Regions:
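Short, aromatic-rich amphipathic segments at membrane interfaces
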Residues: 167, 172, 194-221
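Alpha-helical transmembrane segments
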Residues: 226-240
Length: 243
């Protein structure tokens, strides 16, 4: 739901505006299914806006196998934000049903993407009536920024916006530890901690297989290995007959 405004008992949007004007820090996630015009107006002051539609990855190595909407984005290379300091960027972050974020150059604002789709990604706009996940005419082309940091240089206010509402659940942390460390890095940067102190893992890190890798492994185990076994067996039979 959106923030309430002046016609409500509590003017949440004015409170948020005052907080940011005083140099406040904001970490938020958003859903492609939710409309929040009050909040969007605040984010526009930082040059940030929603890109219409749900991002679908066209590069199978950048999404989970057979799930092109479950994105495995690339990390950005920020020079001002410290959100990725100490984050192990070799681990995957997974964003499912995500939306892009556009960045418009704005006076007195510095903004940097932290997570990006590949250039093969595209956006499906009519998400309530999808008939295919394949690219169609009219789909917006990537790459898309999926998480963005911005700072107002006058007030010191910072916004860190992630265009996915479900990356911060406990079950996902178990299978995608990169989500947890990314969020830890984001939170640490907003409270002035430049380097993320990694905690000792209590469980073995699960293996995440991208779509292209999974397909190659599937072909290997279904076709290549059985064929190799049959060929080897035929060779053994022929050698025995010659004896």
């Amino acid at each position: 739901t959106d923030f309430s405004a002046g016609d409500s008992l509590v003017d949440e949007i004015s409170q948020l505006q005052d907080y940011l004007a005083a140099g406040g820090k904001l970490l938020l996630t958003s859903s492609v299914y939710a409309q929040t015009p009050q909040l969007d107006a605040v984010l526009a002051q930082f040059g940030l806006a929603r890109a219409e539609g749900m991002v679908v990855e066209g590069d199978s190595s950048k999404a989970l196998y057979n799930s092109a909407w479950s994105l495995l984005p690339d990390y950005g290379t920020p020079t001002e934000s410290t959100a990725l300091n100490g984050v192990n960027t070799s681990t995957h972050v997974m964003l499912s049903v995500a939306q892009g974020i556009t960045v418009t150059e704005t006076e007195d604002v510095t903004a940097e993407p932290l997570l990006n789709s590949s250039s093969a990604a595209y956006a499906k706009v009519d998400i309530n009536d999808l008939t295919t996940m394949e690219r169609e005419d009219g789909n917006a082309d990537g790459p898309f920024a999926l998480a963005v940091w911005a700072r107002n240089e006058d007030t010191g206010a910072e916004v860190l916006w992630i265009g996915c509402p479900n990356m911060d659940n406990e079950q996902l942390y178990q299978s995608m530890p990169g989500n947890l460390t990314f969020l830890q890095g984001c939170a640490a940067s907003l409270v002035g901690q430049d380097v993320l102190v990694d905690t000792k893992a209590l469980e073995a890190e699960p293996i995440t297989v991208a779509g292209s890798t999974a397909a190659a492994l599937g072909l290997t185990f279904v076709f290549v290995l059985p064929a190799a076994v049959l060929i080897a067996g035929a060779v053994v039979v022929l050698l025995r007959r010659r004896r």
